[in-house]
Amino acid sequence: MALIDLGDVREESAPEPGRRPPRTVGRPARVAAALVLTLVSLAGAAPVAAPSSFTVPARPTTTAFLSDDRLFLLDPADAPAGRGGQLTAYAVPAAGDGPLTPLWRTPLPAAGADDAVLVHRDVVLVTGGSSDGPPRAVAFDLGTGRLRWERPGHVAPAGNALLTLETGGEEPARVSSVDPATGRVGWSVATPADATTFRIRPDGVDRIVASPSSGQVEVWDARSGARLRSADIHPGELPNYQRSQSVDELLLVVRDTAARVTAYGLDELDRRWEIRLGLVAYFAACGPLLCAYGQTGGMWALDRATGDVRWRATRWHETLVEREGRMLVRGPGSGAQDSFAILDAATGRAVADLGTWEVSGRYPADGRPIGVRPADDDRLFVAELDVAGGRTRVLDVLSGVTGDCQADARLLLCRRSGGGFGIWRLAG
């Protein structure tokens, strides 16, 4: 793909766009004027991409999943048409073009539209539920598509193993460690179904936390099954509804209708601090800070050690990437597109307003967020949202695509206007 550098787009060059009808109170401008002018000129000047490097056929109901250099297409079951579900695997070559040949296909009789696909070690996992039963996980051999095992529950990576969470009925939930190759259970623990959360590391879950309304919190090692700590964090108090989330070294407990936040050390369950915020939805690491996100939008950046609010932003509701002291944040946009900006992580100051893009896919630490937006004449701009550089770089302009795109560190996949999907390798 050709690389077109737009240069820096700074906050001070982003006045309110004209002729935009008023929306909700407080909704600011989202598209920097300089970026808009540059993209308009690119629509006529940038070279149109050649036909798709690779193509695969697909129905309108087919869902695609990228994993490194593999592509998986999941076709849900269609009972009225007499079709069962199907999973198809493709390998995406490093070079070349044209239609891809499937590596393998395997039937999925109960596959649904909400199922998901993930790869762990040498197995492909299809996870989801059906209207008449609990969630299930089905494992296939990555190389051949041969069925390895099937079991109930939600599934997540945990180092070399997998964790499954089974809920439902009157019984407590059960978290089990499963061998990815065989599906055999190594160990399991019973936990409260409505009060079990997990701490996520780059290689998967490493802590299981049960924090029921009684206040008796238990923490397990998700790799060994050993119980690490048990403590009553509300001694002498009556049971009160709470929800919790683990972020790095902290266990964050939210009470009083999502207004009071208490932080504990996850290792010792020692109380660190307590603050009051408005209607907290969830938390996430923001570099050295802790970010809290509101149920109705907006975010707070908190000092991890004290809980003090370092800064607040009302426009943004999600952080996608933090890198080199800068954060890529997402806010409300229009249609399938969201607004994006780069903030200084320490102060919340806007470094660059990147305008509106459709961004999807995974964002590994060494990867890069990729956005798409309509150009004209059935074309799409493809751009890298450069966090460290504080700018947007248009990588290419694709023709004959309708959107429904996703990207990982190396590949971009979009639905083609003529049917099926196109796959492109991203420029460096």
Name these PLM-found stretches.
Residues 1-428:
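Secretory-pathway ectodomains
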